[in-house]
């Protein structure tokens, strides 16, 4: 009956004034409180040792504004009562109300020493808002005073107790006290408890930058990357200046970790947007990315990759001149590496300077192809086509000048910008073969083979011959002959024409003879027979293969070899 009902609030959280009917009810409520007082007094007469009745009586006296009587009754009960914490808490509130701050603080200190802060919860439903506010303000100020003047875990724990009183007195919505207590828990290593307090703030204010930053840092210390990045990004979007100051307050190692996490998140998000969204310039996420990139630059202006990220976002938003000027302002001299040059390359594509674009992009295509795969997504289909044609032509020119290493980068750019066009895969494979990087050359030929048209048998046969030739150069004769056999069975004339070109029919037939003889010695007659027949399709005049076939017939009598 003594507990107050919550005051109505409008949709903005502002308390509404009482209606006349509410004011009429106040007299009824006062009568109820008087009745409670009389009943509690009667119970005390029946049992003078009943602490619960005495506390109920003092609460009624408080609500009837009979403060001195309530104070006197509580003071008398304190000496021999088992309910020390509830009595001390009520006395403290009354002392604050009377203006005796020192006495009130001493009483609160005793409650803290007892360690029973839960006694405040029922009191908060009885005491008036202005009186609760007095306790809240005092306890918060006292906690801050302790934190500013003292050091050590014991003082932090004492401050937490005062802050807990302030939070309870506020009804659980004291933002400043929740923030301070969360930070205290963080200092004590109680990260999850700190996160609980930050979440309490965010429940009322989802975009509170202080709570988001603090919570993000707790997740950082727990090595929870996804959660930390989520909160820090929200904090930056809510109040970038504050979030940046908070990041700067961290130790250098922690600053590096959190900024790299945010950077990687931005990179991933940018790549996903470029892949999934054809009309990405209008996507609001790009504006958020721009804010995050600007914040990263402000946290560490010397980090080149942050400037590169910001440039990429400008390019994605089709702000080409702004991106060009930003690159020129941010990088000069030795700072211009292949990643910076590649961004100039993308801009030159936009400006239709295709040869210059290829020159700027090709080095990165050779060193970090996965990054160029992202950059070409800034280009439309026509721009990519123009780029891979220019890169392919330049690669061919360099081959003629016997500059295979330079040509390789251009072919790599052509492969990437053409989305693994078999033509450029074959050209790069030839270049790699000349440079004796046989394993990479085979990978390119395999990719070309995977993109075969089922009707183009001539091209398929030529690719299998190319792969066979590379395998020969890498001294894998067994695997090489297998590829040539595939080519001959697929399109004989085209395969023989390729073999004539390299390594030559006579030479290859000799290799087939060696492999077939090895199979024969291992008594693998069927394999030896097939190898001999295929070798004779390459060079029908090879006498060794003819003699081997005759030996197989004799040795394998009774075995089916064809």
Curated annotation (Swiss-Prot):
Among its keywords, does the record have Nuclease?
no
Name the gene behind this protein: ttc34
Q: Which residues cross the membrane?
A: none
Gene3D superfamilies noted in UniProt: Tetratricopeptide repeat domain
Q: Where is this region: Disordered?
A: 1-30
**Keyword Oxidoreductase tagged:** no
Which parts are the TPR repeats? 51-84, 175-208, 210-242, 304-337, 388-421, 423-455, 461-494, 509-542
Q: Which organism is it from?
A: Xenopus laevis
Q: Where is the composition biased (Basic and acidic residues)?
A: 19-30
Identify this protein by name: Tetratricopeptide repeat protein 34
Task: State the InterPro entries in the record.
Answer: TPR-like_helical_dom_sf, TPR_rpt, TTC34
Q: Which UniProt keywords apply?
A: Repeat, TPR repeat
The record ties this protein, via PROSITE patterns, to: TPR_REGION (PS50293)
């Amino acid at each position: 009956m003594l507990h107050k009902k919550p005051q109505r609030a409008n949709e903005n959280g502002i308390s509404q004034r009482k209606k006349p009917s509410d004011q009429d009810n106040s007299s009824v409520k006062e009568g109820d409180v008087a009745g409670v007082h009389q009943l509690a007094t009667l119970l005390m007469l029946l049992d003078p040792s009943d602490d619960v009745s005495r506390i109920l009586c003092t609460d009624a006296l408080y609500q009837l504004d009979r403060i001195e009587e309530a104070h006197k009754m509580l003071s008398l009960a304190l000496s021999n009562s088992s309910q020390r914490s509830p009595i001390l808490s009520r006395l403290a509130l009354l002392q604050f109300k009377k203006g005796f701050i020192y006495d009130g603080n001493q009483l609160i200190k005793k409650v803290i020493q007892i360690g029973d802060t839960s006694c405040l919860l029922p009191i908060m439903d009885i005491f008036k808002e202005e009186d609760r506010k007095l306790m809240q303000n005092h306890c918060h100020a006292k906690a801050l005073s302790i934190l500013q003047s003292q050091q050590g875990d014991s003082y932090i724990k004492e401050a937490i107790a005062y802050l807990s009183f302030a939070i309870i007195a506020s009804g659980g919505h004291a933002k400043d006290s929740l923030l301070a207590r969360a930070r205290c828990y963080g200092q004590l290593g109680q990260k999850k408890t700190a996160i609980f307090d930050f979440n309490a703030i965010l429940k009322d204010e989802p975009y509170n930058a202080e709570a988001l930053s603090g919570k993000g840092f707790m997740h950082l210390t727990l090595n929870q990357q996804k959660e930390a990045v989520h909160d820090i990004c929200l904090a930056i979007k809510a109040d970038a200046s504050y979030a940046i100051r908070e990041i700067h307050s961290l130790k250098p190692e922690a600053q590096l970790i959190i900024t790299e996490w945010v950077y990687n998140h931005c990179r991933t998000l940018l790549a996903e947007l470029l892949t999934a969204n054809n009309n990405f310039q209008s996507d609001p996420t790009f504006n958020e990315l721009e804010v995050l990139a600007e914040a990263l630059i402000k946290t560490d202006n010397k980090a080149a990759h942050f400037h590169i990220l910001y440039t990429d976002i400008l390019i994605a938003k089709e702000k080409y001149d702004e991106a060009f000027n930003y690159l020129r302002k941010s990088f000069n001299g030795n700072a211009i590496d292949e990643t910076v040059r590649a961004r100039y390359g993308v801009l030159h594509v936009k400006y239709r300077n295709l040869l210059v674009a290829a020159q700027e992009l090709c080095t990165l295509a050779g060193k970090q192809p996965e990054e160029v795969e992202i950059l070409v997504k800034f280009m439309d289909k026509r721009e990519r086509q123009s780029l891979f044609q220019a890169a392919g032509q330049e690669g061919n020119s360099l081959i003629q000048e016997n500059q295979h290493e330079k040509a390789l980068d251009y072919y790599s750019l052509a492969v990437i910008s053409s989305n693994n066009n078999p033509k450029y895969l074959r050209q790069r494979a030839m270049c790699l073969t000349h440079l004796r990087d046989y394993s990479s050359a085979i990978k390119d030929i395999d990719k070309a083979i995977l993109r075969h048209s089922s009707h183009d048998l001539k091209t398929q046969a030529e690719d299998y011959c190319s792969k066979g030739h590379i395998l020969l150069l890498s001294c894998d004769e067994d695997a090489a002959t297998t590829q040539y056999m595939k080519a001959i069975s697929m399109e004989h004339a085209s395969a023989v024409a390729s073999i004539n070109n390299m390594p030559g029919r006579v030479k290859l037939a000799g290799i087939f003879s060696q492999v077939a003889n090895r199979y024969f010695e291992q008594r693998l007659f069927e394999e030896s027979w097939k190898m001999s027949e295929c070798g004779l399709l390459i060079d029908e005049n090879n006498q060794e293969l003819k003699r081997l076939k005759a030996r197989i017939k004799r040795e394998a009598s009774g075995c089916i070899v064809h």
